[in-house]
């Protein structure tokens, strides 16, 4: 699942034990299926599918696994699955968006509401927190994987249509509009750049600090329960999570 900040995805994509990878691949497989359902199996004519494929490749999903998932989705009836988004609040007014892909809306709603409640939060009305986030294409390039010149990478990204380029201690972040994500991702991939993550995501405009141990425990409780929920695909939040608390 996606995290709170611009660079949180690196921790998830590097995670690494087989169980974590299996869970990530399962979620990505569902995203592939819903993208095929919505726009067909031809990646050249389905922009949503192209975005999910880029996300899969950044997560190191094998190409044959991606191809099998697309073919399976094209041959199966996915009409019983639907995408549902929930918005709500965690401790100290933190904003949380939950994207679910489920074949049972009632089950998903019940489990997600329970996760919020157990962490001292609550599910709100549609739109109650989404205005606090920007929908952006985001690519993270790990400095351990890319040893070239930062200025060259920046110019390559900007020339391809990126909106912004940020450098952190261990990675570079490239931001695009959702519409330009495909073009920028392809241009960088063609230049041999590999990604720690690459996806269209929700990025918080500002972040919230949690200073009390109780609030931190409650927030981790919410996020942990959502992470365990098979219906949940992505979680976005604006908690300025301390680095040592990331996995």
Swiss-Prot record:
Any single Gene Ontology cellular-component annotation: cytosol
Annotated localization: Cytoplasm
GO biological process: regulation of DNA-templated transcription
Pfam families: TACO1_YebC_N, Transcrip_reg
Keyword Transcription regulation on entry: yes
PANTHER family the record matches: TRANSCRIPTIONAL REGULATORY PROTEIN YEBC-RELATED, TRANSLATIONAL ACTIVATOR OF CYTOCHROME C OXIDASE 1
Annotated protein name in UniProt: Probable transcriptional regulatory protein EUBELI_00902
Organism of origin: Lachnospira eligens (strain ATCC 27750 / DSM 3376 / VPI C15-48 / C15-B4) (Eubacterium eligens)
